[in-house]
Each structure stands twice: as structure tokens, then as C-alpha cells.
Amino acid sequence: MNRTIRVSAAGDILIMKRLLPGYQDVLPIREFLMQGEVRMANLETTISDGSCYASAYSGGTWLTADAKCLEDTLRYGFNFLGISNNHTMDYSYEGLASTISELKKKDVAYAGAGKNLYEASRPAILDTTAGQIAVIDICSTFENAARAGSQTERQPGRPGLNPLRFSEKYTITEKHAQDLAKIAEVTGINGLRDLHRQEGFIAPLPEGVMEFGGKMFEISKDGTEGRSSSPNPIDVKRTVDAIREAKMTCEAVLVMVHSHEIRKDNDEEADYFLEEFAHACIDAGASAVIGGGTHQLKGIELYRDCPIFYCLGNFIFENQYVRLLPADYMEKYGLNIHTAASIGIARRQEQSSHSLYEIPEVYRSVLPYFEICQGKCTHLELLPVELGMDRENAEKNIPYVADEKTAEKIAEYLTSVSKRYGTEWEYKEGRIVLHA
């Protein structure tokens, strides 16, 4: 029997305050999302009452929101929230436990983090009229202490997120390699790592590879120079195995991935390792890969008739409304540790030469609705949304259905960033669709 699986999705939900009482666009957005039986997004904050210990690190800003904000998030109709992102461990193990507890209270399916690596990498299972759908969530942007660890027969696992590690390699000419070697010699930049390598604490360098400041360089054989990246084979295998296992009992598998990495010097191109990972997921049997992270849209690829959304951008982006920040943040920006969070955020804005809040693309996104039959995408449409860049402060940073002029700009931009994947987009009758 050929069953049709209906999925709708949104990007990153960084919610810090309640939705406005008079906010009406929740209704048409909810109506669009409710077409899907699986309705998914990334929850890019912890949920707590603010009493959890802050980690010594954060995903950029320490984020935690009240449970009432989670209630408002669910007004859009989401029944799955990914929790694997660079803010998962902003408030340490206690913050993660609080987030999971609140999601369970609301009976919301989640994946991407847990008490150990098994739980963090385990898919959520959603029941639909087409059968059970598995959703895996994974993240490539994190402090190493944030990743979940495996349990053994001797020790418990470590709470954290489901990690997608990756390696980078820089290819340079022989002349540039000699220059780096000379700089390393006179500065001692590699001294400690060289010593640790001799003592066996760091693995030996592969043949033909040199290190400089923790980065790996390979001498080019043909004179070309550049950067490449590849996903960690252990993390790829764990994910591929989870996809294949889920396919044994589920009608479809979806993979959500959170990644802030970039290919060169802008947020428009997916990193090399992310493309390789997404393709591996589809090759293993996943029906779609849904990405987030870089706060603006990336390209959409149809790979083997399955959609890959490399980044859906923002759905709610209220980073400037953070209500609590630890002393670590204030010290970083030269402020008294008792300074109010709003002043701390303002200080960071003052130091920025290219603020996210001044970039139109940060305020524009799409919500995909797609249908899957026999593992392939048979229908795909996008609802263009904007986050109120030109509205009053109280109305900013939450989604509104885009007007025709803005929607056409979104379609044009999406075509530009999707060019490498051969997909073109046009705005037609309130939706963005593939150009015929």
C-alpha cells in the first residue's frame, strides 16, 4: 500500500518572551503547518525557571526561556522539537534535564539530546495515519564538553547532545608550507602540541600533513590551495545505522541537523562536510534532511528525489530579549558582573560592525510542506515568512506571512543560494514553488 506522509517544518525557534496578545499571524502560519502530520522545528533555547547553573561556555549567548514560552511555541502546532544545537548545554546538565522535563509535560516528541549518547542519538517516533515516522536530530556546532558520551559496563554515559563532528584540511603550496614552518619555529605556536604528540597524548600526524596552531595543512600536489571538510566517520556511521534500523519498522525517517559552519566567508553556502553528511543520510534511506543554524536561508537540494534544506533560517529570533546572563558574559564584555542582561546584550551590539539585526536575510525564511510516497518527495511548497524587521520592537522577531514583494525577494534569494543544486524557485499564488 502506497501511503502519503505529510511533513511541515520551520527553522530555529529562539524564543525569549511570550507572544503578543494581539498577534494574529499565528493563525495562518498554524493553518499552513497543520497540513503536516509531522510538524517539526528546532528549539534553540533551554527551558527552565532560571535557577540552573550556567555552563562555563555557551552557544554564543546563554539562553533559557520560561515554560510559558514553550506553550506559546506550541500554538503554531508543532508536535516535534529538535533540541540538539549549540545552546543545548548553556545551562549544563540541569538545564538539559529541565528542558526535557518540560517537553514531556507538554507531550511533545523530541530528539537530539539525552542522558547519554544512546538517548541523544535515538530517533523520536511519531504516529501518523500513514504509519510511524522516525526523526533523528544532530548538531555539528558545539563545545566538546556538550556532546553526549556512551555508557559502558563500567561507567554511566554523559548527558549531552548528539554530535556531528567534522575535520578540516587546508591545502597549500610548498612555499607557503615552508613559510608556516618558519613562523611556527620562531613563535613556538606548535610547541605544546608537539610535546604532547611525542608523549602519546595526541595522535601522530599523517604523512604529508603539517600542523599550525591546531589546524592541519597538506602540501598541494598541483599547486591549488583551499579548504575542505569531511564529517566524522564514527558519527556518520552512528546516524546511518540509526536510519537503517528505524526504516525496519517506520514508514519514513527524517533527519534534522543544526550547523553554524560555513564554507568560506558567508552564511550562504553549506559546508562541505554538511553536504556529504546529508547525502549519506539520504543514501541510507532518509526521506529528507532539514537543516538550521546560520540564522538565514541556505540552498535547497533535491537529491535522489528527496529534499535537503541546508538551513531554514529563523522562525523566532529573540536573542536580544535574553532575561538572564551569567557573570562570564559580563566579564567578556568588560561589564560589572551584576549588570542587567539587556545592557549586556546592548554592549555586544555596540561592538558589532555587522549586526545580525541589520541583515534583511536574517528576517526572511520559508516554511516547507512536503509529501513523501515510497521514500520520495512527491509534492513540495514553501510558505514565505518574514520576522518584522521594519516593525515596532514589540512586534519584531516573530513570523508573519510575507507580502508579495517580500515573498518575491525571498524566492529570488533562494534561487541564488540554490544554484549549485540546480533548483530554481518562483513565487506563485501565495507560495514559493519549484520553477517549472
Positions of the model-derived regions?
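Acidic, metal/ion-coordinating pockets
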Residues: M1-A436
